[in-house]
Amino acid sequence: MGMRMMFTVFLLVVLATTVVSFMSGRAFRDRNAAAKVSDLIALKARRPECCSHPACNVDHPEICR
């Protein structure tokens, strides 16, 4: 294998690694955002319980307004 071909293979590996890393990070952020929305919806359903409990009220002031 020539030096030019080895360099080309190296660049392809770096590019593939970067793309995979970028896509997995993006998927994690999207999944995390969806989980936060789901948690907020669940908390809003339990609003009376949470707002009357001091620790929950401090942790989630956005639902007790």
Swiss-Prot record:
Where does it live in the cell? Secreted
A GO cellular component annotation in the UniProt record: host cell postsynaptic membrane
Example of a GO MF term = toxin activity
> Pro-peptide positions?
22-46
4-carboxyglutamate PTM sites in chain numbering: 49, 62
Is-annotated flag, keyword Zinc-finger?
Answer: no
Query: Which key words tag this protein in UniProt?
Result: Acetylcholine receptor inhibiting toxin, Disulfide bond, Gamma-carboxyglutamic acid, Hydroxylation, Neurotoxin, Postsynaptic neurotoxin, Secreted, Signal, Toxin
* Protein's UniProt keywords contain Cell membrane: no
Question: Which residue ranges does UniProt annotate as crossing the membrane?
Answer: none
Write the signal peptide boundaries.
Answer: 1-21
Q: Map out region (Ser-Xaa-Pro motif, crucial for potent interaction with nAChR) in residue numbers.
A: 52-54
Q: In which tissues is it expressed?
A: Expressed by the venom duct.
Primary location recorded for the protein, binned into one broad class: secreted
Question: Which residues are modified to 4-hydroxyproline?
Answer: 54, 61
Regarding how it is modified after translation, the entry says: Contains 2 disulfide bonds.
Q: Which InterPro entries does the record associate with it?
A: Conotoxin_a-typ, Conotoxin_a-typ_CS
Similarity comment: Belongs to the conotoxin A superfamily.
Q: What does the UniProt entry state concerning the protein's domains?
A: The cysteine framework is I (CC-C-C). Alpha4/7 pattern.
Q: Give the protein's function.
A: Alpha-conotoxins act on postsynaptic membranes, they bind to the nicotinic acetylcholine receptors (nAChR) and thus inhibit them.
Q: What is this protein called?
A: Alpha-conotoxine-like Am1.5
- Species of provenance: Conus amadis (Amadis cone)
